[in-house]
Amino acid sequence: MKRLHIHISVEDLEKSRNFYSALFGMEPTKVKDDYVQWLVDDPAVNFAISTGNTEKGLNHLGLQVDSDEAVQELEERLQNAGVSGEQQKEAVCCYAKSTKYWVQDPEGIIWENYHTMEQMELFGGDSFTGGMGCCEPTFSTSGKWSTGGSC
């Protein structure tokens, strides 16, 4: 099953948690001190909020898929359309280990295409982001990943 992924950076986690729980009509799927996630079935959405980012609002969008092969298919489809991006293998981010392919749309919105392999106890900070976190990649003008991102 594919899910649209939406990640919002918030100021007040508890206030936002209460709002989105009411909006979705369900309790969160995952709750941490700095991160909350809902896996909504109708519509199929992986919705997450987190603190720690100085800029509030939309952090990034994404497509969550069922396999590494599906991530590879997305990567190939995007590359065939002339869209360059960055692979991230075994990324530790948002309390999960995932295979990812990050791209940026023509308006600068970051898209995280990914398959989660397992849940983790660590929020982020893998070597791909220079140990600075995850979830908010920064692309240079060439469309390549910069290690300046953080959650």
Functional labels for PLM-detected ranges:
Residues D41-V45, T54-K56, D66-V71:
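Short, charged/polar surface micro-motifs in flexible loops or helix N-caps
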Residues T51-E55, E118:
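A short, sequence-level motif marking secondary-structure junctions
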